[in-house]
Amino acid sequence: PRATVLGYSREAFGTGWASLADGCTTRSKALHSTFGAVPAAAGSPDPCPAPRNDPIRGPYTGTPITPHDVELDHVLPLAAAWDLGAHAWEQPRREAFANDPRNLIVVAAAANQEKSDQLPSEWMPPKRWQRCAYAHRLADVARAYELSLPRADLREMRRACSGVTGLLGARSM
């Protein structure tokens, strides 16, 4: 398990999803990129279109999900990022991290709640076929924000990708 740094609160990473210039939020954009968007009706007061309601296969569980039963997962959880160094960042960097599309994935709400703030040594997607992609994405986010992952997590990430070439450079793992 990682060392815990006191003082974490969700609000340290902003009060919610960032509002974007087009009137959408980071959450809306993630839903659109996952499900597609329904064009807004002419004259609609809401500039952000609704996501399509067609089910897709959830990336962690493989079960069907729709926009009504999902949450956005921070691939590298905010509390974990805090413990790994985000506690020392300025507020704008923490807010950018919380809203970075590289670190967000639309998943079944239950899967996100099960994962909580755990890193790979404590939690991996239940579907084996998703584990290497998850490890790769988490490593990319950690690298982008210069956060060093604990050895136990790196070991689990390597295990998830054993036999898969090109996961990470030697520096990251």
Language model features with spans:
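N-terminal module-boundary/linker segments of secreted carbohydrate-active enzymes
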Residues: P1-D22, R151-R155, G166-M173
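Domain-level detector of nuclease and nuclease-like folds
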Residues: P55-M173
